[in-house]
């Protein structure tokens, strides 16, 4: 026995005979039932938004304002704080009410989405063509598909511009680089120079270059969102008003499963990029909320021990370590003064607590001897003991302690989860792309289900 994909647009129910898929194939049964598929998607959106709201309120219920967010395992409240809500100088929480509002708004909107999902899954038209030709579609209708793509792009562009509006007109964003240890700041002069914005795309992804992940100021972040927002909206209008060119019609597979594979591929790429951002970037993921990056914790340890030993009388400019290199300070191959020891590998780290101590040629020895501020000392000590490393002993030069088994950095959670999910999405992309291409070539008949245990089981109903 072979499970076939149904080519009929007139499928009227969701059993195996009419759809080609059994109940356990989930939404595959709804490929040609646009109304029911809409219900599944709206309900799914409701679940996502419900999780966001409920989890925000859960984090808030357990939140201790006196402790850093990253010490409490929080991943949602830090995102709200990064947008400038509820926090003040140094990332200190000054008002928890915005966190409550965000959670409740998500809960309420999830109820609306949930109702819409249930309605379209149970009561709404099976196919949207019954309701309106505007909302109806055929997977093979190339013009309709690119029109739908256009609407999606416009919504994405509006989303990007909402961040711009928050940054420029509605209170600003939290800027970890603000003088004195970070503060909420309105972005009045976003970077619009295309050479700067698109220059990030041309950078090497390695070392100190860091591709787009290397962005280290909010002017460039907001300017980039202005560019991408306008490009998405312009692209959306373009796709609504035009029909696909001949080369596009020939190059792409035009089927529901092909669109699924394209979407999974895009999500996979974004997941991998998000992994790099949350692991390495301390501008859009401020360390005050997410904890230090790995290189940051290592550099913070070098700074902490330098401060300690300098107070005890060590000459940090000339002391040698066990290898003959500088124990506290040394020169990089290109001549800059950098921290010595194992943290030399992270010589190109940049952080707001360290940059005031730099001069024209790396770390400034005079500033290190005479101008380290108490807030820099405190922050280095704090970051040293909160490295995003799951280990009980020294890793990469960071001396962790036995209690660190109770600390897992949000950067570790977010980077690992996004990497794993991005990988699964990549596999899904390849799987569905292969099936879509095979179906288009005319030799995809599905998987032989003869020995499938579920086929010998009684019906659920």
Curated annotation (Swiss-Prot):
The keyword Secreted does not apply. Residues 1-48, 134-155, 254-268, 450-461 are cytoplasmic. GO terms for cellular component: photosystem II; plasma membrane-derived thylakoid membrane. The keyword Nuclease does not apply. It is a multi-pass membrane protein. Binds multiple chlorophylls and provides some of the ligands for the Ca-4Mn-5O cluster of the oxygen-evolving complex. It may also provide a ligand for a Cl- that is required for oxygen evolution. PSII binds additional chlorophylls, carotenoids and specific lipids. Keywords: Chlorophyll, Chromophore, Manganese, Membrane, Metal-binding, Photosynthesis, Photosystem II, Thylakoid, Transmembrane, Transmembrane helix. One of the components of the core complex of photosystem II (PSII). It binds chlorophyll and helps catalyze the primary light-induced photochemical processes of PSII. PSII is a light-driven water:plastoquinone oxidoreductase, using light energy to abstract electrons from H(2)O, generating O(2) and a proton gradient subsequently used for ATP formation. PSII is composed of 1 copy each of membrane proteins PsbA, PsbB, PsbC, PsbD, PsbE, PsbF, PsbH, PsbI, PsbJ, PsbK, PsbL, PsbM, PsbT, PsbX, PsbY, PsbZ, Psb30/Ycf12, peripheral proteins PsbO, CyanoQ (PsbQ), PsbU, PsbV and a large number of cofactors. It forms dimeric complexes. Part of a photosystem II (PSII) assembly intermediate complex PSII-I; crystallized from a strain deleted of psbJ, it forms monomeric PSII before addition of the oxygen evolving complex. This is Photosystem II CP43 reaction center protein.
């Amino acid at each position: 026995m072979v499970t076939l994909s149904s080519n009929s647009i007139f499928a009227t129910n969701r059993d195996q005979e009419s759809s080609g898929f059994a109940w356990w194939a989930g939404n595959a049964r709804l490929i040609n039932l646009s109304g029911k598929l809409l219900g599944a998607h709206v309900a799914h959106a409701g679940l996502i938004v419900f999780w966001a709201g409920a989890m925000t309120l859960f984090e808030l219920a357990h939140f201790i304002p006196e402790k850093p967010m990253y010490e409490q395992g929080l991943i949602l409240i830090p995102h709200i704080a990064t947008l400038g809500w509820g926090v003040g100088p140094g990332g200190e929480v000054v008002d928890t009410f915005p966190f409550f509002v965000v959670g409740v708004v998500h809960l309420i909107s999830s109820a609306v989405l949930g109702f819409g999902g249930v309605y379209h899954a149970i009561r709404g038209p099976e196919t949207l063509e019954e309701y309106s030709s505007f909302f109806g579609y055929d997977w093979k209708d190339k013009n309709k598909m690119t029109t739908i793509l256009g609407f999606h792009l416009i919504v994405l562009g509006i989303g990007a511009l909402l961040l711009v509006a928050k940054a420029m007109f509605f209170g600003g964003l939290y800027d970890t680089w603000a003088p004195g240890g970070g503060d909420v700041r309105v972005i009045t002069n976003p970077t619009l120079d295309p050479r700067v914005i698109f220059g990030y795309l041309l950078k090497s992804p390695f070392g100190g270059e860091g591709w787009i992940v290397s962005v280290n100021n909010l002017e460039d972040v907001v300017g980039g969102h202005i560019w991408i927002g306008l490009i998405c909206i312009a692209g959306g209008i373009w796709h609504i008003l035009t029909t696909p060119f001949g080369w596009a019609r020939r190059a792409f597979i035009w089927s529901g499963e092909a669109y699924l594979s394209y979407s999974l591929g895009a999500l996979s790429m974004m997941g991998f990029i998000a992994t790099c951002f949350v692991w390495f970037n301390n501008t859009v993921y401020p360390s005050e909320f997410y904890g230090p990056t790995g290189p940051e914790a290592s550099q913070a340890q070098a700074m902490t021990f330098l401060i300690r030993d300098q107070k005890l009388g060590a000459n940090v400019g000339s002391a040698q370590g066990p290898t003959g290199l500088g124990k506290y300070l040394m020169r990089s191959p290109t001549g800059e003064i950098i921290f010595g020891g194992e943290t030399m590998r992270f010589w190109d780290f940049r952080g707001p607590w360290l940059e005031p101590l730099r001069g024209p040629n790396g770390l400034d020895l005079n500033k290190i001897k005479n101008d380290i501020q108490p807030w820099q000392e405190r922050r280095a000590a704090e970051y040293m003991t909160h490295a995003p490393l799951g280990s009980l002993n020294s890793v990469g030069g960071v001396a962790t302690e036995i209690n660190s088994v109770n600390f897992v950095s949000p950067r570790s959670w977010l980077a690992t989860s996004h990497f794993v999910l991005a990988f699964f999405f990549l596999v899904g992309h390849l799987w569905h792309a292969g099936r879509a291409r095979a179906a288009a070539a005319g030799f995809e008949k599905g998987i032989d289900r003869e020995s499938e245990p579920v086929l010998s089981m009684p019906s659920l109903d």
